[in-house]
Amino acid sequence: MRILLIEDDPQLGRATQMGLEQAGYAVDWVQSAESAHMAVRLHRYGCLLLDLALPGEDGMQALATLRRGGYDGAILIVTARDQIVDRVTGLDAGADDFIVKPFDLDELAARMRSACRRVAGRTHE
């Protein structure tokens, strides 16, 4: 599965990309919402991992733009924000899951697989 990682922190981005690639995923990593929009136009992704604290357009705005633009794949918010209001807002805005940093890579991969199964079920109904 090809994944788009949208994370502006270089250390976390590299570590997440490497960990997921070692688990067998193809990972494209961008550091801004603007780059994410371009990547989604150019490639087909099974899953997007979206940080909320991005430079310029933040993750919540990016999520809304992606969904309005027709992206129907799985989107998982991966963020340090752990408030219930952030979780509810993100899920209501169209995220398929919400994962708080720091996270375990095995759990992240399991949640990605789960979200992709749900999305696949939606498209076959």
Task: Describe the residue ranges of each PLM region.
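N-terminal/domain-start alpha-helical segments
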Residues: 1-123
